[in-house]
């Protein structure tokens, strides 16, 4: 019985020493914690944040009202109404709404879009005080696209080889 007691004590001491050495090793390494509101970490080019509608360089909106994003959305968060055909035969949306309270940020709308009109941008700080502020209309989505166009274009270019 004495040998069992002795081996238990030595095992405890060995475990204690190894755990102490592990703690000391990480104690002297550089810290990886970020002070979030003041420091921001890197985002992946594939990060899916706040939605945005993009424009062509001439200022015309990209969305052609094909409604593929509305059809593929598993949460049924997108509502689109298409206007009449224009003289050149193309269509544009008269209504493009996203209910962000339903959105699950899966990115299927972005993948389904044939003209890269709807994208999920790099912004993740869009907290609101009311639910009504999370109902995005076409004007807000276009404003998001205008605000984040440089970052969105860079992320799409980085992701292009994998699409």
From Swiss-Prot:
Q: How is the cofactor bound?
A: Binds 2 [4Fe-4S] clusters per subunit.
Q: Which key words tag this protein in UniProt?
A: 4Fe-4S, Cell inner membrane, Cell membrane, Iron, Iron-sulfur, Membrane, Metal-binding, NAD, Quinone, Repeat, Translocase, Ubiquinone
| Catalytic activity line of the entry | a quinone + NADH + 5 H(+)(in) = a quinol + NAD(+) + 4 H(+)(out)
Membrane topology, from the record: Peripheral membrane protein
Q: What is its EC number?
A: 7.1.1.-
The 4Fe-4S ferredoxin-type domain covers: 53-83, 94-123
Which PROSITE patterns does this one have?
A: 4FE4S_FER_1 (PS00198), 4FE4S_FER_2 (PS51379)
Extract one GO BP annotation from the record. Answer: aerobic respiration
Annotated GO molecular function terms are:
4 iron, 4 sulfur cluster binding; iron ion binding; NADH:ubiquinone reductase (non-electrogenic) activity; quinone binding
Task: Kindly list the GO CC terms recorded for this protein.
Answer: plasma membrane
Family matches, as InterPro entries: 4Fe4S_Fe-S-bd (IPR017896), 4Fe4S_Fe_S_CS (IPR017900), NADH_quinone_OxRdtase_chainI (IPR010226)
Described by its record, this protein's role is as follows: NDH-1 shuttles electrons from NADH, via FMN and iron-sulfur (Fe-S) centers, to quinones in the respiratory chain. The immediate electron acceptor for the enzyme in this species is believed to be ubiquinone. Couples the redox reaction to proton translocation (for every two electrons transferred, four hydrogen ions are translocated across the cytoplasmic membrane), and thus conserves the redox energy in a proton gradient.
Describe the family membership recorded for this protein in Swiss-Prot or TrEMBL.
Belongs to the complex I 23 kDa subunit family.
Protein name per the record? NADH-quinone oxidoreductase subunit I
Q: Which organism is it from?
A: Parvibaculum lavamentivorans (strain DS-1 / DSM 13023 / NCIMB 13966)
